[in-house]
Amino acid sequence: MVKAVCVLAGSGDVKGVVRFEQQDDGDVTVEGKIEGLTDGNHGFHIHVFGDNTNGCLSAGPHFNPQNKNHGSPKDADRHVGDLGNVTAEGGVAQFKFTDPQISLKGERSIIGRTAVVHEKQDDLGKGGDDESLKTGNAGGRLACGVIGFCP
């Protein structure tokens, strides 16, 4: 079993912790709690760089090693880092899901990359414009953190 953790922080009140677990070469389980969000859906993605020197902006674009368009976590054709939306109620998003495309090892590894929670709902690449195919029109980056191995 390989485990990783990400502590999310931003310039405002949004903060959280997300944990990742992978058994052998199976799907990755993603479990987290993010506080300080407005109620509703917020895009949640893995971005390329583990660089937060300029806040969440320096994390770069979505992790996309196969050079595909943005999509839903259920789409075969999507960025590896496209994890869809997390839903906040009462300012808190608590979630647990599995994802078949991210990994904690190998060429699709998210270790050392940045997890980002966004201001708006991710349209899952169905928005009908160029930005939808890049970012899902998820808006600004509220909080982020570098993903690292943990015991």
Swiss-Prot record:
Its EC number is 1.15.1.1. Zn(2+) binds at residues 62, 70, 79, 82. It catalyses: 2 superoxide + 2 H(+) = H2O2 + O2. A lipid is attached at residue 6 (S-palmitoyl cysteine). The keyword Oxidoreductase applies. Disulfide bonds join 56-144. SUPFAM superfamilies: Cu,Zn superoxide dismutase-like (SSF49329). Its main location: cytoplasm. Its cofactor is Cu cation; Zn(2+). The keyword Nucleus applies. Keywords: Antioxidant, Copper, Cytoplasm, Disulfide bond, Lipoprotein, Metal-binding, Nucleus, Oxidoreductase, Palmitate, Zinc. GO terms for biological process: removal of superoxide radicals. It is found in: Cytoplasm; Nucleus. It is an enzyme of class 1 (oxidoreductase). Gene3D superfamilies: Superoxide dismutase, copper/zinc binding domain. One of its GO terms (molecular function) is superoxide dismutase activity. Cu cation binds at residues 45, 47, 62, 118. GO terms for cellular component: cytosol; mitochondrion; nucleus; peroxisome. Binds 1 copper ion per subunit. It comes from the Eukaryota. Belongs to the Cu-Zn superoxide dismutase family. Homodimer, and heterodimer of Superoxide dismutase [Cu-Zn] A and B. Destroys radicals which are normally produced within the cells and which are toxic to biological systems. This is Superoxide dismutase [Cu-Zn] A. It comes from Xenopus laevis. The gene is sod1-a.
